[in-house]
Structures are given as C-alpha cells and as structure tokens.
Amino acid sequence: MQQFLRYNINVIKEDNDKNYGKYIVKPLEKGFGITLGNALRRVMLSHLPGSSVFALKIKGISHEFGFIPGVKEDVTQIILNIKNLVVWISDNMITDETLSETPIEKWPVMTIRANKAGIIKAGDIECPLGFEVFNKDLEICTLSEDAEVAIDIYATRGRGFKTAAENRSEIGSLSIIPIDSNFNPIIKVGYHVEEETSDVITDKLIIEVGTNGLIKSGDAIAIASKILSDHLKPLIDINKSLHDIQVLNEKNVEEKNKKLSIPIEQLDLTVRSYNCLKRHGIQTVEELVTRSKSEIENIRNLGKKSVREINKKLSELYDLKLKNN
C-alpha cells in the first residue's frame, strides 16, 4: 500500500483555561483536510459526553407556567436560566452505573434556599459531594422582596440532547418539572482547509474549538478522534492482516521537516538575494516555500531573475520549489 503523509498537530492559540483553542493539522494528503475536519466537527457537535440539568422541583409550583410570589421572573424564565448551568459531576465519586441505578427520590440534589431580596446566582447553589457548578456568576432569579424560594435541581451525565418529554418518562413524579438537557460541552467548533504547496500539494486543516469548561478544547479533539477510531476498528477487523500495515509514512515527514527548518544561509544564494530575503523576515526554507513566485518577485530589489535563482537552488538542494501564483 502506498503510504500517506504523517501529519503534525500544532497549537496556534489557546486561552489561559484552555476552554478555547485553535489548532493546525498538517501536512495532510490533498482531500483529507475536509475528510478529517468534517468528521471531527460532527462528532464534537453531537456525541461528546457531558453533564446537564434534567429536572427541578420548586416549592409550591407544580408546572413550568407558574409564578413564585416575590420573585421577578416567572417559572419559565427561571427554567431557561437554569438550563444554562454548567454542572460538573465527578467520575471518581459518582459512576454512570450509580446514576443509572439511583431512583429519583434518592438522587443527589443541588439546592437553592433564599429568603432575602436580591439576585440569586449559580454560586448560591448548594451542591452535594461530587457535584460542582462552574459558571457561578449566572443569574437564576431576582427576589424583589423578602420571600422564600426553595428549588431542588437534578443533574446527570449524558450525550447529545434530550427533550423535557424524554426526561419526563424517567422521572415518574408529578411534583418534579422535567426540562430539556443539552449534555454537549462544545459551545462552538469550526474548521477550514487551506492548500499548501512545496514539493507536493497538501492540505492544512485549521480547527477552532470552544467549550463550556467541562472539557478542554484539545481534549475535545482527542475524545472525538477516539470515538471515531473505535467506531472504525470493527470495520478494519474485516481483514485482520491490515493491522500489520503501516499507512502513515513517518520517515517522509521527518525528512521534510528537516528540510523546511533549514536556514536560508544554506541555499548558497547570491548576496543580493540573501540580504533581500533576510530584510523581508524570511529565515528558513519553510518560510520561503510557503510564498508564491509573485510574492518573492515583489520583495524590494528582487525580480524574476532572483526567483529563478531561488527556485533552482531549492530544487537542486532539497527537491522543493516556490508556490505557483
């Protein structure tokens, strides 16, 4: 089997808490940028595990269309606010098996208890052991006067999206109000593909991921890749002899990376061409071959003759060339 290029993953940008990240994947065989980008995006948008509120219980309220005396917001608005809670549930302390076997009457409940005028925020929620609210500044409701508010909040783990109707079937209690659950920890994910030309035309995949804090952006890509990999493994097992075949060629990439990191001093250019490239900030072969012929021609004091010289040196020494216009 003809081998494919082995690619590298580099971080372009990450915020301090790593909930947002921009990553570059290259070099990919032409066409694989869209193939990988689309597959990863679809998995991240729909199939990553997370946690979410699925129901709540409000003292004195039996349905979502009621009002709490002394509270500015109606119950519908309170529910909309609570839907935005980012709830973390410890894997070590509370397993999926425990949650699936726990009846709603014994569920570990997060609580709001207030009786003074003011804004109630997510940071005011009392959490049981193994639960934590991440977005503590989220406003839940406003007490316009001294009034009693008692809210029990139920959260669990899951994947994707579940409607209130789906959650209702698992609750079985009229006093508990089911709500929609969005378990996906991804806020946004996008990608685009750029073409790169050196000795061959390759794809460069740029992926941008933002999360709600339950997962790091880099981990989101890793988990999505693991989900895809495990779904493909049974298909590979149709022909088990394929396990011994190396599909990605590591040597080619290592050699190419060495070529690209070579300083332009080693091209043995004329003094004029060398000085012009240096003044323009071009230090390595990679910075040179990612530019087109017209870009190099437009550098001050360079022209078509210099471009021919540079291309000749790249070809003779490293089997590389400038990008076509």
Swiss-Prot record:
Its EC number is 2.7.7.6. Residues 255-325 are annotated as: Alpha C-terminal domain (alpha-CTD). The keyword Ion transport does not apply. It comes from the Bacteria. One of its GO terms (molecular function) is protein dimerization activity. It catalyses: RNA(n) + a ribonucleoside 5'-triphosphate = RNA(n+1) + diphosphate. InterPro entries: DNA-dir_RNA_pol_insert (IPR011262), DNA-dir_RNA_pol_RpoA/D/Rpb3 (IPR011263), DNA-dir_RpoA (IPR011773), RBP11-like (IPR036603), RNAP_asu_C (IPR011260), RNApol_insert_sf (IPR036643). Keywords: DNA-directed RNA polymerase, Nucleotidyltransferase, Transcription, Transferase. GO terms for biological process: DNA-templated transcription. Residues 1-239 are annotated as: Alpha N-terminal domain (alpha-NTD). GO terms for cellular component: cytoplasm; DNA-directed RNA polymerase complex. Homodimer. The RNAP catalytic core consists of 2 alpha, 1 beta, 1 beta' and 1 omega subunit. When a sigma factor is associated with the core the holoenzyme is formed, which can initiate transcription. DNA-dependent RNA polymerase catalyzes the transcription of DNA into RNA using the four ribonucleoside triphosphates as substrates. Belongs to the RNA polymerase alpha chain family. This is DNA-directed RNA polymerase subunit alpha. The gene is rpoA.
